[in-house]
């Protein structure tokens, strides 16, 4: 317990009311444009219609004060004069400004966390595909996984309470409540709500959702040392919380009623737990038994239900045995398979055949889900037969070929780590023939005649394989290069993939 408390020690700087003074001071824009914070985090444009700077926010707040827009009429409590003029624009600017300011302390704490741990090159931890080499090294020795889906916040007050653990500023929290209550109807309806809220207030939505996710994640500080190969970038930023000692004591009391304290501590300190998160999914893997994983499931459900004051459905946590189930993660179907290996041993005149099984992580392309995505994007029908793309028929030939080729290369690049590439070749075939049908539709010709006329030019655009890419790096092709091509190639320069990992969305 002392070790846990040492991890959760509070920082005095978190107890100051810094957010509210910043939002009304003159020098706020100096913080936002500080080069040390990183342009991509604090001063990234969100589009021509949604550009926001802290200077604009400052002037907008001053204008609202001059017009007394914060003062509500006592005679007509149903009206809200705050949004009488330029409702959508004012709401968007204020919400994005709030998120822009809120990112400042998180960026400062993340920067200090990297300096404390001497992690100069943080880019090496940002690659999405760095997860899979980690899984290859560790998952082959594990037995069970907990596949956890993070729930959406069911009430705006939960989002506000998430910020209260590191921010003690009542005025800023009231402003946040005011912004969120305006979108309450959209937040409680999963599809319409989230789309409306995220499109109009994208920066605020991402900021609040990330803070909500990290509230789920901070519990895994207890097994942080076991997952040191892939530390989440949010660890150093979101771990410390106000009132953490009360939460730890409550945890102990809850589990003392179920089991004795020694069993509790053993559960927390289980040495072979591995943790990975991406978007709304947690993966907690162990080489223990199903009984141990059920204990972890009970532990997590009880903790999150108390912490978020909501019903956390146990069915959101699945216990799967790696040898019998495939894991849908980052756009791949991953599983651990036993590869048989027969070794012949001979001693004098006697010979023996020894059967050995070697566990190996298999990563497969989810071909049916990819075809569904291609069908939604109108590249093929639901059976996987290629069709033309009429909306692109007005473009130039080179533009059409470039668009199809770029999609094909992106898919080939991302799924190059697949154990079996036969499914990937089928996707390339669909895109190539869809491109040919689109060009034939544009020129009012048949596909066969058009392919015969265009010939190798269209073929080269789609058949540039990993072997050709590697040949640009290695001066001479060799048998070793062909062996590398047949094996998995993890491109460690992929930082964001959009819909490639979310294959249920459109490509």
Curated annotation (Swiss-Prot):
One of its GO terms (cellular component) is chloroplast. GO terms for molecular function: RNA binding. This is Maturase K. It holds the Pfam family MatK_N. Coiled coil: none annotated. It comes from Craterostigma plantagineum (Blue gem). It is found in: Plastid, Chloroplast. Its main location: plastid. Usually encoded in the trnK tRNA gene intron. Probably assists in splicing its own and other chloroplast group II introns. Keywords: Chloroplast, mRNA processing, Plastid, RNA-binding, tRNA processing. GO terms for biological process: mRNA processing; RNA splicing; tRNA processing. The gene is matK. It comes from the Eukaryota. Belongs to the intron maturase 2 family. MatK subfamily.
